[in-house]
């Protein structure tokens, strides 16, 4: 059997799972893997490879890491590989916009996008699906065009978002959904057995990359909205508030009470309303939020009991979180 020649482009673990599926299927000749440059991470600012690069190196695939594709040496190398007209492009969470001339010369160009398009075009679809309280998420295999995530849809599959899910768990689930969907549908698509369907432009929504401002918790929102925001940013970029003028990250929480604050007992949003040796509850614009896992400035992530036994002893009922 002649293997389909492709160039794979992707960056995080989601993409590495998809790439591993392509490798293991033994149906594809992967001429090159394109991923983001190594980045410095953590307090020690250690240089770290992307999960896609780590995987590619273990199986001796050539790796290209352009800071930006347009005008780069790597772009020239990719164009050379594509010139035969027999090589396709497969992407999954690459993190860069592909120049149009790549799409022009590739045999085909398909993207594994982690949303049920046309909802959540953009770089943070899983984050926004959770933050918006969606009950399901999914993956779309789609044709790539010059407009971001706007190409015709080849296939879709969905999976539930459970109350206990966060960005990390959904990334993992959807990576396998995307892997299986791509492996099932790409051969059929290339053989002409599947016809791509246009997206309904009236139903388009966007999920741009999370801004630093978006990470801040607005305590005037409801407990349910803040709960969704916290899990929609765990484990990255992590929702945060201020305590004593310093950043206070919240990784996990739960809605303790969704009753609307009434005029007989008005609570100030962001105010600590209950503190025991094992729990900490905060008033919101509507309802009470219980904090479960936090990270004070300059400290490691910890469960709420550890926090309350240590630094949290300084926190008192009536104290206010936020600006």
Curated annotation (Swiss-Prot):
InterPro entries: Fmt, Formyl_trans_C, Formyl_trans_C_sf, Formyl_transf_N, Formyl_transf_N_sf, Formyl_transferase-like_C_sf, Met-tRNA-FMT_C, Met-tRNA-FMT_N. NCBIfam families: fmt (TIGR00460). Attaches a formyl group to the free amino group of methionyl-tRNA(fMet). The formyl group appears to play a dual role in the initiator identity of N-formylmethionyl-tRNA by promoting its recognition by IF2 and preventing the misappropriation of this tRNA by the elongation apparatus. One of its GO terms (cellular component) is cytosol. It catalyses: L-methionyl-tRNA(fMet) + (6R)-10-formyltetrahydrofolate = N-formyl-L-methionyl-tRNA(fMet) + (6S)-5,6,7,8-tetrahydrofolate + H(+). (6S)-5,6,7,8-tetrahydrofolate binds at residues 115-118. Its EC number is 2.1.2.9. Pfam families: Formyl_trans_C, Formyl_trans_N. Keywords: Protein biosynthesis, Transferase. The keyword Ribosomal protein does not apply. One of its GO terms (molecular function) is methionyl-tRNA formyltransferase activity. PANTHER family: METHIONYL-TRNA FORMYLTRANSFERASE, METHIONYL-TRNA FORMYLTRANSFERASE, MITOCHONDRIAL. Gene3D superfamilies: Formyl transferase, C-terminal domain, Formyl transferase, N-terminal domain. The keyword Protein biosynthesis applies. This is Methionyl-tRNA formyltransferase. Belongs to the Fmt family.
């Amino acid at each position: 059997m002649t293997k389909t020649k492709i160039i794979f482009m992707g960056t995080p673990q989601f993409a590495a799972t998809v790439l591993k599926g392509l490798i293991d299927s033994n149906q594809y000749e992967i001429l090159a893997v394109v991923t983001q440059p190594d980045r410095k991470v953590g307090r020690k600012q250690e240089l770290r490879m992307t999960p896609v690069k780590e995987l590619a190196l273990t199986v001796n695939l050539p790796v290209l890491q352009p800071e930006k594709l347009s005008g780069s040496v790597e772009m020239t190398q990719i164009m050379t590989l594509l010139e035969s007209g027999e090589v396709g492009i497969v992407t999954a969470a690459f993190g860069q916009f592909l120049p149009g001339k790549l799409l022009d010369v590739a045999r085909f160009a398909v993207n594994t996008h982690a949303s049920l398009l046309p909802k959540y075009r953009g770089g943070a679809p899983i984050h926004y699906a959770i933050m918006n309280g969606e009950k399901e998420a999914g993956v779309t295999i789609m044709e790539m065009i010059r407009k971001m995530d706007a190409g015709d849809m080849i296939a879709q599959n969905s999976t539930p978002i459970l109350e206990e899910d966060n960005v990390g768990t959904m990334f993992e689930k959807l990576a396998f959904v995307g892997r299986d969907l791509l492996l099932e549908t790409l051969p059929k698509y290339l053989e002409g057995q599947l016809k791509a369907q246009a997206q309904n432009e009236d139903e388009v929504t966007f999920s741009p990359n999370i801004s630093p401002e978006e990470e801040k918790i607005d305590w005037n929102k409801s407990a349910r909205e803040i709960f969704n925001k916290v899990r929609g940013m765990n484990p990255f970029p992590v929702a945060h508030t201020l305590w004593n003028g310093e950043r206070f990250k919240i990784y996990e929480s739960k809605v303790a009470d969704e009753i609307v604050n009434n005029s007989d007992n008005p609570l100030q949003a962001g105010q600590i309303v209950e503190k025991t040796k094992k729990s900490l509850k905060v008033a919101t614009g509507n309802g009470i939020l219980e904090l479960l896992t936090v990270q004070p400035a300059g400290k490691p992530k910890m469960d709420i009991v550890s926090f309350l036994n240590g630094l949290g002893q300084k926190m008192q009922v009536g104290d206010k979180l936020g600006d």
